[in-house]
Amino acid sequence: MNMFMALSVNIILSTCLILIAFWLPQLNLYNEKANPYECGFDQSSTARLPFSMKFFLVAITFLLFDLEIALLLPLPWAIQMYSINTMMLTAFILVSILALGLAYEWVQKGLEWTE
């Protein structure tokens, strides 16, 4: 019975919050709120604006390093090593490889905004 009460209270509460979130913004409607947010771009202009290639390259580099850190850094702890020295050595090697990649990008001027 307690499980049923908790479930029904959660359903009623979430339904009320959804309805409030749906109807409350419609009470105070103005032009800026009705327009979609376009990440700093003017939504009335053309969609074919030129895109900065330097920004694109820095963004791709950030995504690559971010994914490498997110996916590879937990690896030494995930493979259940018994020796802490081996685990720390593996983590140090992974971070060193990432640091070398970052240094290579820096030397190749891949992180600079100037043309």
UniProtKB/Swiss-Prot annotation:
One of its GO terms (biological process) is mitochondrial electron transport, NADH to ubiquinone. Its EC number is 7.1.1.2. Pfam families: Oxidored_q4 (PF00507). One of its GO terms (molecular function) is NADH dehydrogenase (ubiquinone) activity. It is a multi-pass membrane protein. It catalyses: a ubiquinone + NADH + 5 H(+)(in) = a ubiquinol + NAD(+) + 4 H(+)(out). GO terms for cellular component: mitochondrial inner membrane; NADH dehydrogenase complex. It is found in: Mitochondrion inner membrane. The keyword Mitochondrion applies. Gene3D superfamilies: NADH:ubiquinone/plastoquinone oxidoreductase, chain 3. The keyword Transmembrane applies. Keywords: Electron transport, Membrane, Mitochondrion, Mitochondrion inner membrane, NAD, Respiratory chain, Translocase, Transmembrane, Transmembrane helix, Transport, Ubiquinone. The chain crosses the membrane at residues 4-24, 55-75, 87-107. Core subunit of respiratory chain NADH dehydrogenase (Complex I) which is composed of 45 different subunits. Interacts with TMEM186. Interacts with TMEM242. Belongs to the complex I subunit 3 family. Core subunit of the mitochondrial membrane respiratory chain NADH dehydrogenase (Complex I) which catalyzes electron transfer from NADH through the respiratory chain, using ubiquinone as an electron acceptor. Essential for the catalytic activity of complex I. This is NADH-ubiquinone oxidoreductase chain 3. The gene is MT-ND3.
